[in-house]
Amino acid sequence: MASPGIEVELLGKGHSDLGEVAPEIKASERRTAVAIADLEWREMEGDDCEFRYGDGTNEAQDNDFPTVERSRLQEMLSLLGLETYQVQKLSLQDSLQISFDSMKNWAPQVPKDLPWNFLRKLQALNADARNTTMVLDVLPDARPVEKESQMEEEIIYWDPADDLAADIYSFSELPTPDTPVNPLDLLCALLLSSDSFLQQEIALKMALCQFALPLVLPDSENHYHTFLLWAMRGIVRTWWSQPPRGMGSFREDSVVLSRAPAFAFVRMDVSSNSKSQLLNAVLSPGHRQWDCFWHRDLNLGTNAREISDGLVEISWFFPSGREDLDIFPEPVAFLNLRGDIGSHWLQFKLLTEISSAVFILTDNISKKEYKLLYSMKESTTKYYFILSPYRGKRNTNLRFLNKLIPVLKIDHSHVLVKVSSTDSDSFVKRIRAIVGNVLRAPCRRVSVEDMAHAARKLGLKVDEDCEECQKAKDRMERITRKIKDSDAYRRDELRLQGDPWRKAAQVEKEFCQLQWAVDPPEKHRAELRRRLLELRMQQNGHDPSSGVQEFISGISSPSLSEKQYFLRWMEWGLARVAQPRLRQPPETLLTLRPKHGGTTDVGEPLWPEPLGVEHFLREMGQFYEAESCLVEAGRLPAGQRRFAHFPGLASELLLTGLPLELIDGSTLSMPVRWVTGLLKELHVRLERRSRLVVLSTVGVPGTGKSTLLNTMFGLRFATGKSCGPRGAFMQLITVAEGFSQDLGCDHILVIDSGGLIGGALTSAGDRFELEASLATLLMGLSNVTVISLAETKDIPAAILHAFLRLEKTGHMPNYQFVYQNLHDVSVPGPRPRDKRQLLDPPGDLSRAAAQMEKQGDGFRALAGLAFCDPEKQHIWHIPGLWHGAPPMAAVSLAYSEAIFELKRCLLENIRNGLSNQNKNIQQLIELVRRL
């Protein structure tokens, strides 16, 4: 048996070798690094020590072990019905399809229901998403209709001559609801079966629900654990930043890029105390504990973990600026390793390298545990022990603990004892005090990117290191490195926007108004046509800039994955280099609220429009518009077109789930040729599945329209003061083929509009007329319109005008008025009488609107119109989004449930034909041209 000195020498050498592994580690190098880690344990083991290193990453260490692990993983995937997604991964678009299940709040009955139940509830930000309880005793009609119809089809086409015995065996082998599934196993199985973009969506929704996020995903089947860097790229958090001197302010940043001290909690051998419960208590302000980390006292929390041991989770504390809520003065990351550190040595080594302090929970410290920790002799991390020493090994614990004190450079203050009689609140305060002391001293601060760098050195796979992702990142950087000032970049590189586009849009509006005039002067019409052609020729004389050409190359990639990676990288890269500048000092953010009745100049918003992907697509649209206009006028032969393929590229992006701009937010005008060209290409790509229902939202700023749509359908509309769209964006949702006949459409086109001003009719002049036209256009295109309100008397005047204009045409979509309580989750919804008052605009406002639309004083209250009855679910009260105070607040369960009911009602109305006549894409094209 090797002496301790020799052991340490060997381990030190192994650690040095690992530290020299290149950041871009290859597969062979990764296997070498894993083998070195395994060799450390082989050198440490003595003949009298039965402990075996078992992280499942090295097949050579035990010929039987990987086989057992493989079968365990495969059994779990088979149990959950996910084995078919191991080659062709489950995609984000697959998970967002509208099906029979979208209309039913059904409970899972068999394990194969669990992944879909989790995804559906997570999409709706339901705090109960992690519950894997299955219901046995349910009525037959409580099962999803889609599954019933599938069973009926099987009965219809069943051949009695088929092998009955085989049918009996397959029936008897179906998993039963008695099979318990640990929620962490479900999460790991689903992540292993999902592509990178669905993994990213899962992480984003989990963050909104304040669930702990998977950081290292174990995969014993393929002998690689994966560090999930890409999966967390899209998570952005806002918190209160208070410098030592000066004024505090809110800061917004990606969790991947912002640096914070990290504290790891791990288990060694066995522990009577729950790490996850302790972490939840440490993270929760006041007496309300939020179950961020799933723990043993929750439903099914005691079920054995089959595949999730080795999972590393992460969560953060973010300060809010309120002394009564802020546990720590700065952001702090907390890491939790599932399983024993001896069985997951690579993960433990990673945690020791990235953490400022590691808390080790254990009941036993014997020779085996001593050897384990002795190998960390050179570590600079602080170590703390949380012991429960009442298992007959108290003396042994003390003996080895005393030997570890000089090895780990700790003292007796680093040893905490927690037994059943220990006061939990006092113990939590003590843990917080330790963390606070570490924060006040110089300590390591790391970002998730820094953690990924350390993971590569240890041989862990990083999800972001695939070739397609890195190629897309390189292309993004070639574009963004040239952006020093976003305003200057738009002026110099996106030349067709700005004044040329505004002038062309104004001329086209005037020309359109002449179309409706009784006797338009031909001379004026000819002059407008001449001016428009002149502007379009000026635009067509430009070539796309180098940045736009690089962007076009990125979205033209034949690889769908590379194209999607590129678009995501562009979103984050542009947000990083072109962060909007506040037009008011930071302290005003605390008191900012939308002014629904004032005369605020909407042309000068608090947040300037940030540079985004939509600006590059808008530039492509203007090249196409200018070229098409010249071809129509006979000024350019059709054979000389250079940009005819642009709408096809954009339609492919729409099919992948990217929101596309329908109405330009800066001019509030629609590039008709570009939009119709895009829809034509969409019709070609969808072939026979081109029946559409159009659902739009309109309303005042800051009422949560985009968040509502994102929660309801899993969409990606921009949210927040700094990035909310000012025009209108559209996104396509696919209806499952088995449900499209019943619903009456193949796709739902969802349109999210920017805010519409309210208040006096003449206060904003031409701007008001533009927004009234925008409301009329969106409501006129729609089968269903959701009108989002925040106060009981704030129906914008632009919407009143749109009602009056559409009533003349006879086109009345199905309207749903949504009143969102943005500030208080506990305020009850309006009573029926209040609902009717909600639809009665102020008398002077309604009379003025009627007079402007030449209807005299005959304007009726909205509640009196046939299409809007407050008693028939046309008016909805949505509780507040947050349960508690952000940034540590979770999404309210009441909000999630109310959104689900609204979604169910909308789909029922579409299904029952209450949403006016459904359209196909060609009809929508004609409607766009007409409106």
Curated annotation (Swiss-Prot):
Q: Which InterPro entries match?
A: G_VLIG_dom (IPR030383), GTP-bd (IPR006073), P-loop_NTPase (IPR027417)
Q: In which tissues is it expressed?
A: Strongly expressed in hepatitis B virus-infected liver and in HCC cells. Also highly expressed in well-differentiated gastric cancer tissues and various gastric cancer cell lines.
Record PTM Phosphoserine, positions in chain:
S3
Residue ranges of every copy of the VLIG-type G domain listed in the record: 689-929
What does its record list under induction? By HBxAg. Up-regulated in gastric cancer tissues and also in gastric cancer cell lines (at protein level).
List GO molecular-function terms, semicolon-separated. GTP binding
Cellular component (GO) terms are:
cytosol; nucleus
Keywords in alphabetical order, please. Cell cycle, Cytoplasm, GTP-binding, Nucleotide-binding, Nucleus, Phosphoprotein
Q: Which compartment or compartments is the protein found in? A: Cytoplasm; Nucleus
- The residues the entry assigns to the signal sequence are none
| UniProt keyword annotation of Calcium present | no
This chain's function reads: May be involved in cell cycle progression through the regulation of cyclin D1 expression. May participate in the development of hepatocellular carcinoma (HCC) by promoting hepatocellular growth and survival. May play an important role in development of gastric cancer.
Q: Which family does it belong to?
A: Belongs to the TRAFAC class dynamin-like GTPase superfamily. Very large inducible GTPase (VLIG) family.
- Official protein name in the record: Up-regulator of cell proliferation
